[in-house]
């Protein structure tokens, strides 16, 4: 069972953090709706869906244009917001954007599941070395599960993928959720090997909307002003922490996790 290990209070500008030592810039993979590349810089685009609704009318596409939309509205702008937050926190990294949400014929958000997430994360496994990916940021979650006993409905395939990524040095960060639940985070954030991220406010307060519980790993800033909008929620906190993870990467998963855990209080004090 996990427990909250750190309040990362507005730490994203902490100047004393060690820089990542590598010839190639670190990268994070953002799994989300779609991205507007006129507003954020994306190093590479991928589309992975359960339906044949990628721009090439297939379930898989990669390369320029794979994750973009002509008119990203009706919720599809969410991916642009997450990318902008990550880029603001850490401009010295690459963003690999993986679109996993299809558009219906009417232009609304289509169906995606934890199997979609798993397939996208398997792509990260195959391409981790090529792009130097050190973290994934996933905003999606669900709380449609029983309140009795152990509530986390683990998809073993997804869990195995998270464990494999962890062994390769890649953190799988999931949003805890914005459902005001003070005992449980959303699934898949509740998976023990996932890094569950809750939200704090600009004053360092735990946001009332943020889910919490024994499965939570970190709180991070959940309020960000990007692309002309104020974005609030655990999704933004997750994207921000993924970018900060890349900024403070210690060469492997566990040393980075421990660095953030052991220094979170100090970080909060030093930037206050």
Protein language model features and the residues they cover:
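Structural recognition of the beta-strand scaffold that forms the well-ordered cores
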Residues: 27-31, 94-99, 132-139, 171-175, ...
């Amino acid at each position: 069972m996990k427990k909250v290990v750190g309040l990362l209070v507005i730490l994203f500008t902490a100047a004393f953090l060690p820089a990542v030592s590598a010839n190639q810039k670190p990268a994070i993979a953002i799994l989300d709706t779609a991205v507007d590349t006129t507003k954020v810089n994306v190093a590479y685009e991928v589309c992975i869906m359960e339906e044949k609704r990628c721009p090439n009318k297939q379930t898989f596409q990669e390369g320029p244009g794979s994750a973009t939309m002509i008119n990203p509205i009706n919720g599809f702008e969410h991916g642009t917001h997450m990318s902008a937050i990550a880029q603001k926190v850490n401009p010295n990294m690459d963003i690999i954007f993986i679109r996993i949400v299809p558009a219906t014929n009417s232009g609304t958000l289509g169906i995606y599941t934890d199997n979609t997430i798993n397939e996208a994360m398997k792509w990260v496994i195959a391409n981790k070395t090529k792009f130097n990916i050190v973290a994934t940021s996933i905003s999606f979650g669900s709380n449609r599960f029983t309140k009795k006993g152990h509530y986390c409905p683990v998809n073993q395939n997804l869990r195995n993928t998270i464990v494999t990524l962890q062994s390769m040095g890649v953190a799988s960060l999931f949003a805890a959720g914005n459902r005001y639940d003070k005992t449980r985070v959303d699934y898949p954030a509740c998976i023990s090997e996932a890094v569950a991220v809750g939200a704090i406010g600009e004053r360092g307060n735990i946001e009332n909307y943020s889910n919490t519980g024994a499965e939570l790993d970190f709180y991070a800033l959940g309020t960000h002003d990007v692309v002309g909008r104020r974005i609030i929620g655990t999704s933004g906190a997750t994207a921000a922490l993924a970018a900060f993870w890349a900024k403070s990467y210690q060469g492997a998963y566990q040393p980075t996790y421990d660095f953030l855990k052991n220094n979170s209080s100090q970080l909060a004090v030093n930037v206050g």
